[in-house]
Amino acid sequence: MNLALKSPAPRSGILDIAAYVPGKEHAPGVAKVHKLSSNETPLGASPRAIEAFQKAAFNLERYPDGQANALKEAIAAVHGLNPANILCGNGSDELLGLLCHTYLGPGDEGIVTEHGFLVYKIQITASGGTPVTVKERQERVDVDAILAAVTERTKIVFIANPANPTGTYIPVEEVRRLHAGLPAGVLLVLDAAYAEYVRRNDYEAGLELVSSNRNVVMTRTFSKIYGLAGLRIGWMYAPRDVVEALDRVRGPFNLNAAAIAAGAAAIRDQAFVAAAVDQNHTWLAKIGQALTDIGLRVTPSVTNFVLIHFPEEAGMSASDADAYLTSRGFILRAVGAYGFPNALRMTIGSEEANKGVVAALTEFMGRK
């Protein structure tokens, strides 16, 4: 006991964590704003999900199902899974945190990649562990670099596939090679938040690896293609012993009733999902080509966003472009915290928003 303290002190390391900062939402003084900073779908939620959400309003006095069984069963039906291997959470962020708090402690290490989702480092550190950052290769996860970083202290490895903010992915054979090189006691976490958008024959979100191994989990979200970011719904497919371990430490009612109902309705409406995939696929190609045509480098993406790189010239930097776009009502995401100080991430939005950004950046680049 330290009687000299004048107020409660956080655990060592907590105040060293840089708080997560979401994408900005406002453009002061602009009448119409197009928010393209958080990878939200321009199509909104399925009408079926909205209807289910509205119906849930008539039972607000009742606690939700603590196991979210209706949602688990809907997920299982769509993906052909066993509901017993599914755990739902208040966004996949909660599940990532639960994994760290369950499998990491002081002296343990968690491996992340240099441009990986910032929440990985936050949760590793918050759990008392030490994040170990490995280099990527050409803005892609480098399997060899990860395997070279594994030590006897490594307990967990995080990869986002596809990755955010690059939009790149690694083929399933590379994921298998990564898993094969890890000790059995190391947990491989495959964050597949953008899996629904991928149209590549050599991609697999993680269902196969989880089904055949005891040290792999896959996390998914309803915040992107399903348009339910405001409800915070995530899910995890994992070996039964991992699900049981996390069930011991998660909150007893971690997913609200409206989220359960809307999520179940959304995932069953696969026609709506297919329309969203088609819309994104069309505009992803158009945006990439249009930005390349005006002299910008765009990282090839398989997701619903693109990473745009700007010239290393005075007045032409990403921060200059960000200010220029914001003044015209287009909000993109600065990604300096992800190791890209001279790039912006753009969500694929509505036709109006997409064309508007291209027009604004054409004007911006024409000032050289």
Curated annotation (Swiss-Prot):
The answer to whether UniProt assigns keyword Manganese to this entry is no
Pfam families membership = Aminotran_1_2
Which keywords does this chain's UniProt record carry?
A: Amino-acid biosynthesis, Aminotransferase, Histidine biosynthesis, Pyridoxal phosphate, Transferase
One annotated GO molecular function is:
histidinol-phosphate transaminase activity
EC number(s) recorded for this UniProt protein: 2.6.1.9
**InterPro entries cross-referenced by the UniProt entry:** Aminotransferase_I/II_large (IPR004839), HisP_aminotrans (IPR005861), HistidinolP_aminotransfase (IPR050106), PyrdxlP-dep_Trfase (IPR015424), PyrdxlP-dep_Trfase_major (IPR015421), PyrdxlP-dep_Trfase_small (IPR015422)
Chloroplast among keywords: no
* Cofactors (names): pyridoxal 5'-phosphate
Q: For this chain's UniProt record, which GO biological process terms are given?
A: L-histidine biosynthetic process
N6-(pyridoxal phosphate)lysine: modified positions: 224
Give me the reactions it catalyses. Answer: L-histidinol phosphate + 2-oxoglutarate = 3-(imidazol-4-yl)-2-oxopropyl phosphate + L-glutamate
Q: Pathway listed for it?
A: Amino-acid biosynthesis; L-histidine biosynthesis; L-histidine from 5-phospho-alpha-D-ribose 1-diphosphate: step 7/9
Q: Tell me the subunit arrangement.
A: Homodimer.
So what family is this one in?
A: Belongs to the class-II pyridoxal-phosphate-dependent aminotransferase family. Histidinol-phosphate aminotransferase subfamily.
Q: What is this protein called?
A: Histidinol-phosphate aminotransferase 1
